[in-house]
Amino acid sequence: MDDNKKKMLESALKSIDKAFGKGTLVRLGDKEVEKIDSISTGSVGLDIALGIGGVPKGRIVEIYGPESSGKTTLTLHIIAECQKKGGVCAFVDAEHALDVKYAANLGVDVDNLYVSQPDFGEQALDIVETLAKSGAIDLVVVDSVAALTPKSEIEGDMGDQHVGLQARLMSQALRKLTGVVHKMGTTVIFINQIRMKIGQMGYGSPETTTGGNALKFYASVRLDIRRIATLKQNDESIGNRAKVKVVKNKVAPPFKVAEFDIMFGEGISKMGELVDYGVKLDIVDKSGSWFSYKDKKLGQGRENAKIYLKENPKVADEILAAIREQMGSESLSSSSDDDDIKEESGEE
């Protein structure tokens, strides 16, 4: 850069600093690149798929899928992981459907969870903004976007037309929230539902999410969760197999996929993930229906292998450490999965 341009740039920088405060505009080479911190999802596979060991801090995240696919279960696991690291969490229950007992079963410290059940959408989003601005909250979950009904719609009559009201509400709220959550390091997770596009013909997915397009743009991470199978034992349903696709990821490569078991009343099965990823990475040997690790027989059949790992947390810890080492994720090594293994096995 020639001297004349350099003087002009220095003059412009001084003017900007004077008008908006020192450090408003900085050269990236003069500033240390900040590592993006994360909150574990409670699933080893999903943490790996997200690339940074979980959902990013200080960002907006959207988790969407059909009914009973595991959206709320996944967010409750994220809350539990955040609390284990000393984080303060809030749950904005716009659907008025939070099951406190189930949340406790998943490891959520319900006594220290802040819960709000707002009357209308504007109130819910104002609460989220106030919590984020406080700088004291690490994670806010909104369940769900579809339930954020504008005040004018609630106060109106049945059958009244309210075209685009919710989309405008979300667009305005997200414009205000994005900068605040980044500055304060608060993660905001929006749970969303799926609707079918009216009159969809030809190419493209017939599905869309509620609340307009704003959330699609402002979210740093978007997770699509689906139930792909029902898990049965002796003809009795004991859980679901879930598949999560990272549809959008601004902090790591997108389009990664993770699968895990969600057991009824228990949530994500970490032992199931250890078996699956252990086999995938050749850490656990599978010969026919038998699973083994080193010289130890884990059991015949996947369910028996999971039971063995529950009863032998030291073996589970070894397999988890080997998975982390092979996947090469530094952020995973600081997650609290070891504690989860001990909890799932019943060890104190």
Swiss-Prot record:
Q: Matching HAMAP family, A to Z?
A: RecA
Which cellular compartments is it found in?
A: Cytoplasm
Classification via CDD domains: RecA
Q: Which InterPro entries match?
A: AAA+_ATPase, DNA_recomb/repair_RecA, DNA_recomb/repair_RecA_CS, P-loop_NTPase, RecA-like_C, RecA-like_N, RecA_ATP-bd, RecA_C_sf
Q: Which domain of life is it from?
A: Bacteria
Annotated residues for binding of ATP: 65-72
Keywords tagged on the record: ATP-binding, Cytoplasm, DNA damage, DNA recombination, DNA repair, DNA-binding, Nucleotide-binding, SOS response
Is Transferase among this UniProt entry's keywords?
no
**Record-given protein name:** Protein RecA
**UniProt function note:** Can catalyze the hydrolysis of ATP in the presence of single-stranded DNA, the ATP-dependent uptake of single-stranded DNA by duplex DNA, and the ATP-dependent hybridization of homologous single-stranded DNAs. It interacts with LexA causing its activation and leading to its autocatalytic cleavage.
Chain intervals with Acidic residues compositional bias: 336-348
Which GO biological process annotations does it have? DNA recombination; DNA repair; SOS response
User: What does the similarity note say?
Assistant: Belongs to the RecA family.
Stretches for region Disordered: 326-348
